[in-house]
Swiss-Prot record:
PROSITE patterns: WD_REPEATS_1, WD_REPEATS_2, WD_REPEATS_REGION. Pfam families: WD40 (PF00400). SUPFAM superfamilies: Nitrous oxide reductase, N-terminal domain, TolB, C-terminal domain. The keyword Repeat applies. This is WD repeat-containing protein 1. Disruption phenotype: Embryonic lethal. Partial deficiencies disrupt megakaryocyte maturation, platelet shedding and provoke neutrophilic autoinflammatory disease. GO terms for biological process: actin cytoskeleton organization; actin filament fragmentation; apical junction assembly; cortical cytoskeleton organization; establishment of planar polarity of follicular epithelium; maintenance of epithelial cell apical/basal polarity; neutrophil mediated immunity; neutrophil migration. It comes from Mus musculus (Mouse). Disulfide bonds: none annotated. The keyword Repeat applies. GO terms for molecular function: actin binding; actin filament binding.
């Protein structure tokens, strides 16, 4: 096998303000799962760096839940499709697919024998359905609500009971199977966001945007108590999760705290303050074995510490929005990956362990378009917020100093020796020296798109939407057009010099990579065909003999310079999402990022 996946650094959950996010637990207690875009992400709870991504939904997935048997997962998307798929094999084969209603699926519940499934959401003609998992035959009706149903749960002991919570401020109670509506519960004054039965089936709890949690008898549906008497939280409550022994309840709220409740004596055991920023609102939670997890509005997953509520044991960071660019850098004997996303967030990853964090301080406020590392160990990034930032990679702290404000929006940045940085903006090429603007070409006569600086530092290649690459010289802090026009096969999407400076690779929107030989006056060396859609990124291997290209066809090719027929093809590198950026950690390790917000490492063998 010429390639194999080495590491997957998964995306964070996709979250929305004021909407609860469901974390699904694995009955064995080893994994947890959540959704982002069209992906379902399964992670090991003890070592979250171990992840698996399921990408077979055609639409955005909202919720995924393990069957109590642990052998299958049911996942539902915004179109109303429910897919039931195998968890035991890497291929995740589809077992059944149903369309219980047309509209967003918001929650899923299984009976303890893994034979029946309840699905709720915002359908057009009904808000819920309950059916047999293998035939799809109905085993009851979910009625009694006149607005979207947000949550459903089924008692895990016989006799079965089913409870729902809705935007009509009510919960509803059902007996079955076949499940029949018994009564509505009108104790809440705002949307009911979450209903959950305790594992032993004796009680169920409802949580609402009014900040209250009510406990009811699991068999009869009679009210037992309100947690915290009048109010459980100062803000809306988005999620609740029972402890495995059914005595305690974990709650997550918009008041930026999570709490553990002792349900038997109706008191708070611990309060976890998560911060003061709006991004610290808590939208989801999960209690699995000894692990207490919560999701913040930032998308971060917090491992809560019962012994020290003020500080989480660990926080899983990463990206929840599409990654636009990446670069790699060795620091203190370790290789780090830096990735920048659509929301301006830059994250750094230890390439071996997957340990990661974001820079401290206030950084870019809009999409990070391109990043590279200069000779003084600074990360140079350009963003749609019209700035170029220089960030010290030892301190990893955004400072107020290293920011250059530009007149127009930058699209690409490249660095060379001597403190030079070349920035391609909309209709402008800017030369910076030592973080100061020293020269610019306004109205170059074409639309520049991408830029690369020769390792020697004296030459700059700029690719344009007109399908040409122009070569400039850096002379005494100015850019001089050498009058050299290199023709690509279509609008240029990326340019890259090999590390020894001998070759320039150019990729274009016409699905072709052209390599020019620098020493022979930029004569055409070879042309590489294979992609089925626009190529968007290029990266040279440190051996200068191979280079990789990634495109909108979800494919990555690793090409051999001397022979275009000898290539490694990584099909579906990021399934259903196009590859956005590439970089090499060493001669045999390639890193790819994509709009699915994940980072992957591949081992390439020739």
């Amino acid at each position: 096998m010429p390639y194999e996946i080495k590491k997957v650094f998964a995306s964070l959950p996709q979250v929305e303000r004021g909407v609860s996010k469901i974390l699904g637990g694995d009955p064995k207690g080893d994994h947890f799962l959540y959704t982002n875009g069209k992906c379902v992400i399964l992670r090991n709870i003890d070592n979250p760096a171990i992840a698996d991504i399921y990408t077979e939904h055609a639409h955005q997935v909202v919720v995924a839940k393990y069957a109590p048997s642990g052998f299958y997962i049911a996942s539902g998307d915004i179109s109303g499709k429910l897919r039931i798929w195998d968890t035991t094999q890497k291929e995740h084969l589809l077992k059944y697919e149903y369309q219980p209603f047309a509209g967003k699926i918001k929650d899923i519940a299984w009976t303890e024998d893994s034979k029946r499934i309840a699905v709720v959401g915002e359908g057009r003609e009904k808000f819920g359905a309950v059916f047999l998992w293998d035939t799809g035959s109905s085993v009851g009706e979910i009625t009694g609500h006149n607005k979207v149903i947000n949550s459903v749960d089924i008692k895990q002991t016989r006799p079965y009971r089913l409870a729902t919570g809705s935007d009509d401020n009510c919960a509803a109670f059902f007996e079955g199977p076949p499940f029949k509506f018994k009564f509505t519960i009108g104790d809440h004054s705002r949307f009911v966001n979450c209903v959950r039965f305790s594992p032993d089936g004796n009680r169920f709890a409802t949580a609402s945007a009014d900040g209250q949690i009510f406990i009811y008898d699991g068999k009869t549906g009679e009210k037992v108590c309100a947690l915290g008497e009048s109010k459980a939280h100062d803000g809306g409550i988005y999620a609740i999760s029972w402890s495995p022994d059914s005595t305690h309840l974990l709650s997550a709220s918009g008041d930026k705290t999570s709490k553990i409740w002792d349900v038997n004596v109706n008191s708070v055991v611990s309060t976890f303050p998560m911060g003061s920023n709006v991004l610290d609102q808590q939208l989801g939670c999960l209690w699995q074995k000894d692990h207490l997890l919560s999701i913040s509005l930032s998308g971060y997953i917090n491992y809560l510490d019962k012994n020290n509520p003020s500080k989480p044991l660990r926080v899983i960071k990463g990206h929840s929005k599409s990654i636009q660019c990446l670069t790699v850098h060795r620091n203190g004997g370790k290789s780090y990956i830096y990735s920048g996303s659509h929301d301006g967030h830059i994250n750094y990853w230890d390439s071996e362990t997957g340990e990661n964090d974001s820079f401290s301080g206030k950084g870019h406020t809009n999409q990070v378009s391109r990043m590279t590392v200069n000779e003084s160990e600074q990360l140079v990034s350009c963003s749609m917020d019209d700035t170029v930032r220089y960030t010290n990679l030892t301190l990893r702290d955004y400072s107020g100093q290293g920011v250059v404000k530009l007149d127009v929006q930058p699209k690409c940045v490249a660095v060379g020796p001597g403190g030079y940085t070349v920035v391609v903006c909309i209709g402008q090429i800017v030369l910076l020296k030592d973080q100061k603007k020293c020269f610019s070409i306004d109205n170059p006569g074409y639309e520049p798109e991408v830029v690369a600086v020769h390792p020697g530092g004296d030459t700059v290649a700029v690719g344009g939407t007109d399908g040409n690459v122009r070569v400039y010289s850096i002379l005494a802090s100015t850019l001089k057009d050498e009058g050299k026009l290199l023709e690509a096969k279509g609008p240029v999407t990326d340019v890259a010099y090999s590390h020894d400076g001998a070759f320039l690779a150019v990729c274009d929107a016409s699905k072709v990579v052209t390599v020019f030989s620098v020493a022979d006056g930029y004569s055409e060396n070879n042309v590489f065909y294979g992609h089925h859609a626009k190529i968007v990124c290029l990266a040279w291997s440190p051996d200068n003999e191979h280079f990789a290209s990634g495109g909108m066809d979800m494919m990555v090719y690793v090409w051999t310079l001397s022979d275009p027929e000898t290539k490694v093809k990584i099909q579906d590198a990021h399934r259903l999402h196009h590859v956005s950026s590439l970089a090499w950690l060493d001669e045999h390790t390639l890193v790819t990022t994509s709009h699915d917000a994940s980072v992957k490492e591949w081992t390439i063998t020739y």
